[in-house]
Regions:
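Bacterial N-terminal signal peptides that target proteins for export
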Residues: 2-12
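Bacterial N-terminal signal peptides
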Residues: 12-22
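Bacterial Sec-dependent N-terminal signal peptides
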Residues: 21-45
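Middle-to-C-terminal accessory/interaction subdomains
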Residues: 52, 63-65, 86-91, 99, ...
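Conserved oxyanion/phosphate-binding beta-strand-loop segments in alpha/beta enzyme cores
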Residues: 72-131
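Internal "kinase-insert"/substrate-recognition segments embedded within catalytic cores
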Residues: 111, 115-117, 131-132, 153-157, ...
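A conserved alpha-helical element in kinase catalytic cores
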Residues: 133-154
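Short, well-structured beta-strand/strand-turn elements
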Residues: 151-163, 278
């Protein structure tokens, strides 16, 4: 009986050692399974770690995401190479995008249960997972958002690349992007009935409040989302008055233009769209802000920039070639460019900032190197590199680097044409 305490102690030590070894084994495996209560399962045997963060999302009861309206409850967790890099947290997920949700590789909108920093970006609840499906270089949106920031845009969306696993299925490389919204860390305007974030669109069946301007352009209210009748009339009347001004002789006076718009802001936005020759750059996903403060009309501002997968020649549209002007021939620009002083300011802006636009070539080299390894996973999951059969694919490539080189070549030709035709 005297030896029993020692025997019990030995049994306890053996049991403790066994449990310790078992707990360590969770971290030693490349794949985490259902048996791990605090980790979402990740089987990466077919699509191995490729030096990008990995976002694992699992919907409740593996419910499918099949539209842009229904918010599906889910959980998420970030992974590093062989283990989670954060806790399991709650979110809702739904489809997103004007056309990306009709493609095979869906785009998603996620809403977190609480504001957190995602991959080092500013804290918020609302984020977009952009598929970049028809952009085979996968970098067009990324380099353009970075360009806007370098040029001094008041706000440009922060973004980071990751690989997405949804309901235990690998989905490919996505761009995690700040959702465009009014907030302190994003579009920092007041939240009241006389401060507006709105967008030019071509959608007439979209959710939200729309109005059609005197020039027959469709605009959607983003903030306030549910504007009062007074707010609707305030913005609609202001835009219509501005469009009447554009068609008047006053358009030839630059000081008069400055009473309506932030000229520097409009020119910066113009050049980003014109440089990329974004086919959507005069039609939709065009965000604007305007505020009426203490009965004073502030200038209309353009931005943030958004959605460039149809830029850089990535379209079947005959206008997608690297020569000729595009954006100045449409929308409000076709009136503004009648003013010679305004046109000179546009020319001066390019000459002053040309080096910044040229530097996008270095940006492409840098980010494409980061994506090179993961691109093997992407094009294994979605074997579309050689597909040029029509929407959404118009060009074919033998490998990822060829797609990157084609983008760089288009930009070089675009810069040369602009230089020769200012």
């Amino acid at each position: 009986m005297k030896r029993q305490p020692k025997k019990l102690l030995s049994i306890f030590l053996v049991l403790f050692l066994f449990l310790f070894i078992c707990s360590c084994s969770i971290w030693s495996e490349d794949s985490v399974t259902d048996s791990d209560a605090t980790y979402l399962p990740l089987d990466d045997s077919e699509y191995p770690y490729a030096d990008l963060p990995r976002l694992v999302i699992e919907t409740d009861n593996f419910r499918q995401i099949n539209n842009k309206e229904t918010k599906v409850p889910a959980h998420f967790q970030f992974y590093g190479k062989s283990k989670p890099s954060g806790p399991i947290q709650d979110l809702t997920i739904r489809g997103r995008g004007n056309s990306s949700f009709v493609m095979t590789k869906y785009g998603y909108k996620i809403n977190l249960a609480e504001k957190i920093s995602m991959l080092g970006m500013s804290k918020d609840k609302e984020w977009d997972l952009v598929s970049n499906f028809r952009d085979k270089s996968m970098v067009q949106n990324y380099i353009t958002y970075q360009l806007a920031g370098i040029l001094g845009d008041e706000y440009h969306p922060q973004c980071k690349f990751l690989e997405l696993f949804l309901n235990r299925q690998y989905q490919g490389i996505y761009l995690l992007v700040e959702h465009v919204k009014v907030s302190k860390n994003r579009i920092n305007i007041a939240k009241n009935d006389s401060s507006f974030l709105f967008e030019k669109t071509t959608e007439t069946s979209t959710n939200g409040v729309l109005f059609t301007s005197s020039l027959n352009y469709i605009f959607k209210f983003d903030q306030p989302k549910e504007p009062s009748i007074h707010s609707q009339e305030l913005l609609e009347n202001h835009i219509n008055e501005f469009e009447r001004f554009l068609q008047s002789k006053s358009i030839y006076n630059l000081d008069s233009i400055a009473q309506w718009i932030d000229i520097e802001d409009f020119i910066r936005y113009y050049w980003i769209q014109e440089f990329t020759k974004n086919i959507d750059g005069h039609r939709r996903s065009i965000f604007l802000t305007w505020e009426k403060k203490d009965s004073i009309n502030t200038p209309i501002k353009m931005g943030p920039v958004w959605d460039f997968d149809l830029g850089y020649g990535n379209s079947s549209d005959k206008k997608a070639v690297p020569d000729q002007w595009l954006i100045r021939n449409y929308g409000w620009n076709r009136f503004l460019f009648k003013n010679k002083e305004y046109k000179k300011r546009v020319k001066d802006y390019w000459e002053k900032n040309r080096a910044v636009f040229v530097a996008t070539l270095d940006s492409i080299d840098s980010i494409s190197r980061e994506l090179a390894e993961a691109s093997s996973n992407e094009f294994k999951r979605w074997p579309v590199l050689e597909n040029d059969s029509g929407f959404p694919f118009f060009k074919k490539f033998s490998n990822y680097q060829e797609a990157v080189d084609a983008l760089k070549n288009w930009i070089e030709q675009r810069i040369q044409w602009i230089d020769e035709n200012l």
